């Protein structure tokens, strides 16, 4: 098996943009420690250097194969190792997926993300999802897939099928990775990210906060993302959704200001990435989401489901966007 570890920036290596430097963990911690209002202001300034602050990229996420995953990730209700009441479902039919994609596009989504609960796909699975990707791409939607660990050649096959993005999150601080995930390691994730980059796919890579981590550990997650070379085009920041039956069902609540800080620090350290306000929005008041947008979040998952958990209804999202004079970003082939 060929190993394609995604290269990290060397400590002495600086890119032409001053904010694309190597980020030491202590530097990221210093950002977290800034006075709240100063941090939000700094993040907003960085955001405006690279994006229209009123434009929001809308993605819809669909679970095309649900439950029964052999992995043991303490946050995930789809693991076969936990009794969460989730019923295992086989792969959806192509026609049903395409119909869901048509609905998503009609409602304003520009990107359609598809997830399958596998440790990694088999060659026969790649053939099936390649057909699905081609059908969704033909609708004029940007495509994203999250299918787990990839073997050699699979990323190239997905690229050939028309996939734009591959989602593969780093989940948490590398130093605590195996406290949360017990059936793979951080290097496994980096290997697949390397395969994805080698194939010419764009990268969607983020993590989850609210899993009883400390602030320095949140800084470690952001540093590990910011030091990917090149940086991810999309960075989803998820707030843990506590699901009964998972080991993290009783995790301590993360203070809302700490989540907003995480969004702001992600924006400052990854100035050209789309920072996605992802899972956990059903528990976020409008004012909190507004602060996240001010701090540089410029993408959301749009639709009533995020794989197996609830998401705000489309109508409530559009109402909030109208209140804030935000508008959905249209998909163009050259967009990140």
Curated annotation (Swiss-Prot):
Q: Which residues form the Radical SAM core domain?
A: 54-281
What pathway is this protein said to act in by its record?
Cofactor biosynthesis; biotin biosynthesis; biotin from 7,8-diaminononanoate: step 2/2
Reported cofactor(s): [4Fe-4S] cluster; [2Fe-2S] cluster
Its EC number is: 2.8.1.6
Q: Which UniProt keywords apply?
A: 2Fe-2S, 4Fe-4S, Biotin biosynthesis, Iron, Iron-sulfur, Metal-binding, S-adenosyl-L-methionine, Transferase
Member of which family?
Belongs to the radical SAM superfamily. Biotin synthase family.
NCBIfam families per UniProt: bioB (TIGR00433)
Q: What is the name attached to this protein's record?
A: Biotin synthase
- What is the source species? Actinobacillus pleuropneumoniae serotype 5b (strain L20)
Organism ancestry: Bacteria, Pseudomonadati, Pseudomonadota, Gammaproteobacteria, Pasteurellales
Q: Which gene is the coding source of this polypeptide chain?
A: bioB
């Amino acid at each position: 098996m060929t190993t394609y570890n995604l290269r990290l920036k060397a400590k002495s290596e600086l890119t032409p943009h001053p904010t694309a430097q190597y980020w030491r963990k202590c530097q990221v911690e210093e950002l977290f420690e800034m006075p709240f209002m100063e941090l939000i202001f700094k993040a907003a300034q960085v955001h405006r250097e690279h994006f229209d602050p009123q434009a929001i990229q809308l993605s819809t996420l669909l679970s095309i194969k649900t439950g029964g995953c052999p992995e043991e990730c303490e946050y995930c209700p789809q693991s076969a190792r936990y009794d969460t009441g989730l019923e295992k479902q086989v792969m959806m039919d192509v026609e049903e997926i395409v119909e869901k994609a048509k609905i998503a596009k009609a409602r304003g989504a520009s990107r359609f993300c598809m997830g399958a609960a596998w440790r990694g796909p088999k060659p026969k699975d790649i053939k099936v999802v390649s057909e699905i990707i081609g059908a969704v791409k033909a609708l004029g939607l940007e495509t994203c897939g999250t299918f787990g660990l990839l073997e050699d050649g699979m990323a190239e096959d997905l690229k050939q099928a028309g996939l734009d993005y591959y989602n593969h999150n780093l989940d948490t601080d590398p130093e605590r990775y195996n406290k949360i995930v017990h059936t793979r390691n951080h290097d496994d994730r980096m290997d697949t990210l390397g395969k994805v980059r080698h194939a010419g796919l764009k990268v969607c890579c983020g993590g989850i906060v609210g899993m009883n981590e400390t602030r320095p550990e949140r800084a470690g997650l952001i540093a590990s993302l910011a030091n990917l070379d090149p940086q991810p085009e999309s960075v989803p920041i998820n707030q843990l959704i506590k699901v009964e039956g998972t080991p993290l069902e009783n995790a301590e609540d993360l203070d809302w200001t700490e989540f907003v800080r995480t969004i702001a620090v992600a924006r400052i350290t990854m100035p050209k990435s789309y920072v996605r306000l992802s899972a956990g929005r059903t528990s976020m008041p409008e004012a909190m989401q507004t602060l996240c947008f001010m701090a540089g979040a410029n993408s959301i998952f749009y639709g009533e489901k995020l794989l197996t958990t609830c998401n705000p209804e489309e109508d409530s999202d559009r109402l909030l966007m109208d209140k804030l004079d935000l508008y959905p970003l249209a998909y163009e082939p050259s967009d990140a």
